[in-house]
């Protein structure tokens, strides 16, 4: 495995992540403008990018912290870099930052059919607390709501 660095995500990462964002999240994919707006709100939001020694994007993740609650907004790992611990590393670093910002609990939503992501979150001690019916895919796919104390 190559050396993987995790760095604060910047606008420079957006162009590299957009093809993967569209491939992985389909109709729920965020736009480049959406990412730019997210990165501009540093008071409540924090984003990371995982890159290799050539600065190629391998993954990205973001969290929003308001008061004592964190919401994991996105975690993505490019297909060729999956199963190398990148998603777990990004998630752990987001939770560390959320704690630093005063959060005591974290929530997220994940597609009910995304079992790989659910396993990642369960390994990070998230537990299922509910279902949001019709949350994804224009109302055709439910979301599992997960929570953990941090």
Tell where the protein language model's regions lie, with residue ranges:
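Structural motif
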Residues: 101, 119, 123-124
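Acetyl-CoA-dependent GNAT
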Residues: 8-84, 91-97, 101, 149-150
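Residue-level recognition of the GNAT/N-acetyltransferase active site
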Residues: 78, 82, 111-113, 138
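Conserved catalytic-core motifs of GNAT/GCN5-like acyltransferases
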Residues: 109, 122, 127-143
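Conserved GNAT acetyl-CoA-binding A-motif
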Residues: 98-109, 132
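Short hydrophobic/aromatic beta-strand or adjacent loop that forms the aromatic wall/cage
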Residues: 44-45, 141-145
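Short glycine/proline-centered loop/turn elements that form peptide/ligand docking sites
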Residues: 91, 113-117, 134-139
């Amino acid at each position: 495995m190559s050396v993987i660095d995790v760095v604060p995500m910047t606008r420079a990462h957006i162009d590299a992540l957009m093809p993967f964002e569209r491939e992985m999240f389909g109709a729920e994919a965020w736009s480049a403008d959406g990412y730019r707006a997210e990165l501009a709100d540093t008071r409540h939001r924090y984003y990371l990018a995982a890159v290799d020694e050539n600065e190629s994007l391998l993954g990205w993740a973001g969290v929003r912290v308001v008061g004592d609650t964190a919401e994991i907004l996105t975690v993505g790992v490019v297909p060729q870099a999956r199963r190398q611990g990148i998603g777990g590393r990004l998630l752990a670093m987001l939770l560390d930052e959320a704690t630093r910002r005063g959060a005591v609990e974290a929530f997220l939503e994940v597609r009910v059919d995304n079992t790989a992501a659910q396993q990642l979150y369960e390994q990070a001690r998230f537990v299922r607390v509910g279902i949001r019916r019709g949350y994804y895919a224009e109302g055709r796919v439910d979301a599992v709501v997960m929570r953990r104390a941090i």
